[in-house]
Amino acid sequence: MRLNPAKCTFAVEAGKFLGFMLTQRVIEANPDKCQAILNMKSPTCIKEVQQLNGRLAALSRFLAGAAIKSLPFYATLRKGKQFEWTTECEQAFQDFKEFLGRPPILSRPQEREPLILYLAVGSRAIASALVREDENVQQPVYFISKALQGSELNYQKIEKFSYTLILTSR
């Protein structure tokens, strides 16, 4: 294996790694990726909505319930439907921009530390949040969310909870 010395850093306190900002204690969203969304104007075509969804997917581990909040965007992508950027889409877009104005921070769990798992199940999306408790303050470790599609929409509530657990455990 050959390493490129220009791309290597050793014994650093913090830095960018695989698109994330890592420190000894926390993982932060890459400010460049957050800024890309903050600089976006409201989408005017399907291609721009797809681009927005891709950028949000890259930050999804930092966004609680990202799929649930993105449902208005998915509605604009339905085949056979004329593109329409609704007020609901605009509100969701502005909410994401407001949230990303303060880059999200995830806590790093300690070895053998108990973690808390929260599950959320809706009619069209599911989500989970893994958190740790530090001095009676809950700090997020990881977020997962998924928009349900096809036959998944017909699952019973208990099946959706089971599916959320399976998705989270992967």
Region locations from a protein language model:
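C-terminal reverse transcriptase regions that engage the nucleic-acid substrate
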Residues: 1, 6-113
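Secondary-structure transition/capping motifs at alpha-helix termini
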Residues: 1-2, 132-139
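Conserved catalytic motifs of the protein kinase core domain
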Residues: 17, 114, 125, 139-140
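Short, flexible loop/turn elements at secondary-structure junctions
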Residues: 44, 100, 121-123, 147
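Feature representing long, continuous alpha-helical segments
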Residues: 94, 126, 162-166
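Two-metal-ion RNase H-like nuclease active-site motif
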Residues: 113-121, 165
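Acidic, metal-ligating active-site segments
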Residues: 122-132
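A short, polar/acidic, helix/strand-boundary loop motif
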Residues: 136-163, 167
